[in-house]
């Protein structure tokens, strides 16, 4: 299946960071306006710097690159432009529903309030949606308001998410370094979010293992697992007899309840999310094992700039590694659509668009 064909198919993006999806030229132009020094002065070299920095195999090193992207997202103009371009790039890649996650607390250095950050991001997303619609396209976006787990702002950010529930926000996210910063630190916040019926997804099973996933499920009350790739550490499959398999308690819980895994293949290889494999390749990613075992897998980009990727490219890489066909790709999109935090009527419309398009592509 060609890249062009995959690009033309409707897709759903659940795990995509706003501050990880900037255009290199935009970073350069916005940085010049505020006097922020960058490691490169042209778009090609800057793009390569991000790729090289993120191929270290360390989540901590990977996260350091966000110093430069966040630096140019501290003003009204910067946030609107970045959000607009972010969504337009999604639409250009065939995405019809995209959840846009970011941490408002990281965009306050120039005096913006948390509320202004959310409103300016929504303004940019709204501009993009209008442009796509004006050209006959279809794009729905939803903000995932993120609290940084290493900070102590979780309750404030949770209240922000709830306050903007009907103004562009669809859910709450919890990100940052996993090790040492368990969701149990903010268990009362997640209890409160649950009482508010606010959907929650937590980063878990990326920088830490199954205990982090357990915490996300128990104390975080998460509906989805941001990455969740290290659930594989709680599964045994005999290499010589695939019928011989065993699940630990955490893996069994996730499997039996259909908890969606927001897998981001290229990013997972970059950030050391497969710690037992030296220089892992896409064929080493446990995506196919998890899919074959019946886990609710979805395909995502995480940070398009840092991984030099798109959702089309992620699907293409998986197809090349594991031989997926059109039916597989459709199921991945339907999984994501069913796991999304959109309204029910929007979900039904998105599922219909996906089903119709994939049926047409089969002929």
Task: Please annotate each region the language model reported.
Residues 1-198, 206-224, 230-363:
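Metal-cofactor-binding active-site regions of metalloenzymes
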């Amino acid at each position: 299946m060609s890249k062009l064909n995959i690009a033309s198919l409707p897709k759903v993006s659940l795990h995509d960071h706003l501050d990880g999806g900037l255009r290199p030229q935009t970073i350069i132009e916005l940085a010049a306006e505020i006097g922020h020094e960058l490691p490169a002065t042209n778009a090609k070299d800057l793009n390569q710097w991000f790729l090289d920095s993120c191929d270290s195999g360390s989540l901590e090193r990977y996260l350091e690159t966000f110093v430069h992207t966040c630096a140019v997202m501290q003003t009204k103009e910067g946030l609107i432009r970045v959000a607009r371009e972010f969504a337009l790039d999604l639409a250009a890649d065939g995405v019809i529903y995209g959840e846009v996650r970011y941490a408002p607390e990281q965009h306050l250095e120039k005096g913006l309030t948390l509320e202004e950050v959310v409103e300016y991001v929504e303004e940019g997303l709204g501009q993009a949606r209008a442009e796509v619609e004006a050209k006959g396209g279809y794009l729905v976006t939803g903000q995932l308001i993120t609290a940084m787990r290493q900070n102590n702002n979780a309750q404030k950010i949770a209240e922000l998410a709830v306050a903007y529930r009907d103004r562009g926000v669809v859910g709450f996210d919890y990100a940052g370094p996993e090790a040492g910063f368990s969701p149990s630190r903010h268990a009362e916040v997640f209890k409160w979010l649950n009482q508010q019926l606010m959907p929650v997804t937590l980063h878990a099973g990326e920088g830490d293992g199954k205990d982090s996933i357990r915490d996300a499920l128990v104390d975080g009350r998460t509906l989805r697992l941001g990455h969740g790739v290290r659930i594989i550490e709680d599964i045994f499959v005999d290499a010589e007899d695939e019928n011989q398999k065993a699940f630990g308690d955490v893996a069994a819980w996730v499997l039996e309840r259909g908890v969606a895994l927001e897998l981001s293949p290229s990013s997972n290889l970059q950030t050391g999310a497969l710690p037992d494999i030296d220089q892992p390749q896409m064929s080493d990613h446990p995506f196919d094992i998890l899919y074959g075992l019946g886990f609710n897998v979805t395909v995502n980009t995480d940070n398009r700039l840092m991984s030099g990727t798109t959702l089309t490219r992620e699907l293409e890489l998986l197809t090349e590694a594991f031989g997926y066909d059109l039916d597989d790709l459709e199921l991945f999109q339907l999984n994501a659509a069913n796991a999304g935090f959109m309204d029910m009527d929007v979900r039904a419309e998105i599922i219909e668009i996906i089903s119709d398009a994939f049926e047409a592509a089969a002929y």
